[in-house]
A protein has these predicted regions:
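Short, compositionally biased "basic patch" segments
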Residues: 1-20
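Conserved small/polar residues in nucleotide/adenosyl-binding loops
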Residues: 112-116
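Positively charged, polar, low-complexity stretches
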Residues: 28-29, 36-42, 55, 60-85
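Conserved beta-strand segments of the P-loop GTPase G domain that flank and frequently precede/overlap
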Residues: 52-54, 97
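N-terminal first-folded block
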Residues: 17-50
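Short basic, glycine-rich beta-strand/loop surfaces that mediate nucleic-acid
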Residues: 72-111
Length: 116
């Protein structure tokens, strides 16, 4: 007879924490481009699947980004601040692009399940 393992269920992550971990995973996988110019270049070259902005990004930066790449790829605001995201990027960055299709899909799904 097989032995049953009654391990306690892992608690679910908060949506913002799950998104933070997904962005961190993108960085570790080498599928995260950071900074306005690098993101714009990745989008123009067709490498970016998703573009995300920090919640405290400058409105002018977001406007410039939408004007430059808004018709080529989705630009979605994240509920995470630049200070929180600095733990991933080592410096405050407002604009991120995901260059892997499956990781972009993961981040996209988490963006729409997290409270904004």
């Amino acid at each position: 007879m097989a032995k049953k393992h009654n391990a306690p269920a892992k608690p679910a992550l908060e949506p913002n924490e799950a998104l933070f971990q997904a962005v961190s995973l993108c960085r570790k996988a080498g599928a995260l481009t950071m900074g306005f110019d690098a993101v714009e270049d990745a989008v123009v070259k067709g490498k970016a699947w998703l573009v995300m902005t920090a919640s405290d990004a400058s409105p002018k930066t977001v406007q410039r980004l939408n004007y430059a790449v808004g018709d080529m790829v989705d630009v979605i605001p994240m509920p995470l601040t630049q200070d929180k995201l600095a733990d991933i990027s080592r410096k405050p960055v407002a604009i991120y692009a995901v260059t892997d299709r499956n990781l972009a899909k993961l981040c996209f799904c988490l963006l729409y399940t997290s409270p904004s």
